[in-house]
Amino acid sequence: MIFFAAAAIGNIYFQQIYSLPIRVIGMAIALVIAFILAAITNQGTKARAFFNDSRTEARKVVWPTRAEARQTTLIVIGVTMIASLFFWAVDSIIVTVINFLTDLRF
């Protein structure tokens, strides 16, 4: 991670000194070195195993069809509209009651 940050900061620093193709090549070399270092370290191998396991689990998921996703989306939109109307009505009642109480003169 530090290597990525150093590469990005170096890219900003060398913006005035070197042209874009040289900076792109330098950034590519820095990224390759960072990936190599990540692959040979203990944390890098754990991260790679985690990503492989995540990909395996994502393949096991039963994803909804387009029709199911559309129906679920419409249900969520409908419930949201009903809830917003309910809260608007409750808010209006509360505001009316408070206005009535604050306008009373004793």
Swiss-Prot record:
InterPro entries listed in its UniProt record: SecE_bac, SecE_sf, Translocase_SecE/Sec61-g
Segments passing through the bilayer: 20-40, 75-95
Gene3D superfamilies: Preprotein translocase secy subunit
GO molecular function: protein transmembrane transporter activity
Membrane topology: Multi-pass membrane protein
GO CC, alphabetical: plasma membrane
One family name in Pfam for this protein: SecE
UniProt keyword terms in alphabetical order: Cell inner membrane, Cell membrane, Membrane, Protein transport, Translocation, Transmembrane, Transmembrane helix, Transport
Location within or outside the cell: Cell inner membrane
Main localization of the protein described in the UniProt heading: membrane
GO biological process, one term: protein transport by the Sec complex
Record keyword Phosphoprotein present: no
Subunit structure comment from the entry: Component of the Sec protein translocase complex. Heterotrimer consisting of SecY, SecE and SecG subunits. The heterotrimers can form oligomers, although 1 heterotrimer is thought to be able to translocate proteins. Interacts with the ribosome. Interacts with SecDF, and other proteins may be involved. Interacts with SecA.
Family: Belongs to the SecE/SEC61-gamma family.
Summary of the function given for this chain in its UniProt record: Essential subunit of the Sec protein translocation channel SecYEG. Clamps together the 2 halves of SecY. May contact the channel plug during translocation.
Name assigned to this protein: Protein translocase subunit SecE
Gene, per the UniProt record: secE
